[in-house]
Amino acid sequence: ATETEKTVYLEEDHLGLNEVVVTGSRTARPIKMSPVTTQVLGGKQLVEAGYSNLQQALQQETPGLNIQKVGFGNEISMQGLDARHVLFLMDGERMTGDMAGNLDYERFNLHAIDRIEIVKGASSTLYGSRAAGAVINLITKKTTKPLSIDAGVRYGQMNERNYKNPQPKDFLYMFEKNADRPNLQGWVSAGFKAGKVTSQTDAWYSSSDAFYMYQAENDKKVYTQEANPFLPHDITVVNSSSRPPMGIEGKEHITVSQKLYYDPTDDLSVLVYGSTFFMNTYDLIQDMTFSQARDWTAGAKLTYHVKDWFSVTGSLHADFYDRFKRHERIDTRNKDYESSIWQPRLTITSNYFDGHSLIFGVEHTSDELTSDRFSGNANHDLKTRALKETEYFLQDEWTINPKWMVSAGLRTNFSKAFGFMGMPKIAAKYSPNERWSIRANYSMGYRSPSIKELFFNWDHLGMFMIRGNENMQPEKNNYFSLGAEYSNDRLFLSGTAYGNYFRDKIEGVWRIYDMQYNFEYTNLSKQRLLGLEALLRWHVLDCLTLNGTYSFVNVSKNEGIQVNTTSPHAATASLDYKFTKKNYRLNAVFSASYMGRKKFDVQDRVFVEEDNKSYDAYFRCDLPQYVLCNLSVSQTFYNKVKLTLGVDNIFNYVPKTLGSGITMFNVPATPGTRGWVQLEFMLDDVINSLRKKK
C-alpha cells in the first residue's frame, strides 16, 4: 500500500469576518451573520499598532469617535453625542464613577483586552439607559493554553520638564516630584488552563507627567448676528491680557484583575471575577493636595444548559468607586465622592425553535451616589442620592432563510422616579450572496436623568454653580439606519446612513444671573442628528493592509444656536506592513487621524454701546481642523521578545486656541512630537523552550 500525503493550507482571516461577537444580540454569532452592524477591534492588533491606552486606540480606530480635553478632564463623543449616551461595558457589565458620563478611562487595561465590540445606534432594548447612542463592550482575555504569560514595559519622552532636581528638603518637594513623574508603563498578563479550571490574571501600572498647554493669542469672542439677531452688528471682544496656560494633569495608576472559570460538566459553567483600580491625579495647582480614585468590582456568573432546550444564566455584578482629596505632606485624605451600583440579572436563551434565537431577561439596577456637591454651599457636606430601576427585555433573532434575517425586541423599564417606559427595536439583514449584505435598523432609545443631573447643587470655587433639575423627564430618541457592506478575500467596504431624532433631550446650558455663571440641566424640545459613516479594509498585498474610516454628522440647531461641539467631519487611516521569516517578524504601522473644523456657540453676556446696556448673548467658537500622525515599528525575535519603537504626533501639532473666558474648548491634549520604546516578553514560550532543552 502506498501512503498518500496531504498538505493542508490554513488561510488567515485578514478581515475578521468570521470573528464571533456577542454585544449586538447578547448571543454569540459570527460578525458577518449578525443583523446588527458591529465593529470589532482586536486587542492584540491594538497593542501591535503601538497605542499606549484605550483612549488613543479608540480615537484612531473608530469612525466618528473623538476624545478631547475639556475643563473637567477627558470628554468622549460619538456620532454627535457625548459620553452620557455612550455605554461602556467590561465583559457586558456596567461601571460607575463617571463625570459627565465619562469614566476614568485609565481603568481599562489595553493589554488585558481580547477584543472591543462597538455597536452604534440606540441599544436601549438590550442594555437600557445610557445606550441611546452606542455601546462599547470590552471583552477581556481568557487563555486557551495550559500556560500563558506575557509581560512588558514601555518608556516615553516626558511631556514637559516642570522642575529641575527637586530636593526632599524643599517645601513643595512632593508637588514637584509628582508633576514630573516618568512616562512609564509595565504590565503582566498570566493565565493557565488545568482540567476544568481556567484562570486569567492581568496587572498594569502606568504613570505620566503633567504639562502646560499655551494659547498663542489673547482671548477673543465674536458675537454674531446669526446667533444673536437682536444685535445691531457683529461684536468682537479681545481680552487685553494673555490667557493663562492650561494645565494637563499627570497621572499614576495601577489596575489588577482576576477571573476564575470552573466548568464541572458540559452543561454547567461558573465564573467568579474581581478587579481593583487605584489612581493619583497630579495637577499643576500648588494647593498642597492631589486627587485619588479607588475602585473595586466583583461579580459571579453561573450558566446552566437544559439539554438543547434553553440555557439559564444568573449573575450578580457590583462596582464601588471612591474619590478623595489627598494632602501632599500629611498622611490624610478626605472623601468627597462615593458611588456604587448593584446589578443582579437573570437571562434565558434558547435555540430550540428552528431558525429562532430567543433571549429573555430581567435585571435590577441600584445606583447610589454620595457627594459634597448636593448641598449648594462651601461646607462640603456629604449627602446621598439613589436611583433604582427594574427592567425586562425580550428579543428574537429569526433566520428566515440563508438570505434573510430579522431581529425584533422590546424592553420595559420601571422606576419609582419616572414610572413605566417601553423601548422596541427591529433590525433586518439581507444577503443576496456571500459578498454583499444590506442591513436596516430601527430602535427606540431612552436615557433617564442621572443622579448628578437631578440633584447636583455645587458651587465651583465661587466661579459658577452647577445645578440639577428634579423636574426633568427621561429623554427619548428614535434611531434609523441603513447600511451596505461588500467583502471578498482582500477587501471589506461598509457604508451606513443614519438619523437620530431626540425629544426632551437632556442638556447642560449656561445661564447668567445672580452676578455669576450658572450651568443648569434641562430638557430641550427636540434635536436631530443625521450622519454617514464609511469603513475600508483593503489587504493590498500579503504584507500590506490599508485601513480607513470617514464620518459625517449634521446636528440641528436649537433656535438658531449650535450648542453641539462635534465636528461635522472626521476620518482615520492607517497603513500596516508585515514581514515574516523564521524566528523573526517585522511590523510597521503608520496611522493618521483627521478632525474637521468645529463651529459652535457658547452663552455669555455682551455690552452693546449703542444701547448702553448688556445682554445675554452667544459668542461663536471657531476651532481649526487638524491631523495627528503616529508611526510604530516592532520586531519580534524567536517569538519570545518583541521590541517596538514609535513616534506619536510626528508633525508636532499643538493647539493654538484653548478657550475664552471661563470656557475651555475641547482640544486634543498633546504636547507635540514624542518618542517611545516598548519591550515585551512572551514568557510562556521562553519556559517551554527551556523545558524542551531539558
Where in this protein do the model-derived segments appear?
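Gram-negative outer-membrane beta-barrel transporters
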Residues: 152, 399-406, 498-501, 522-603, ...
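Short acidic/polar hinge/loop motifs at secondary-structure boundaries
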Residues: 93-120, 138-141
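Face-selective signature of the C-terminal outer-membrane beta-barrel domain
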Residues: 200, 257-279, 293-418, 429-431, ...
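Extracytoplasmic beta-strand/coil segments of soluble accessory domains associated
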Residues: 38, 55-97, 114, 134
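Periplasmic-side early beta-strands and strand-to-turn transitions of outer-membrane beta-barrels
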Residues: 152-291
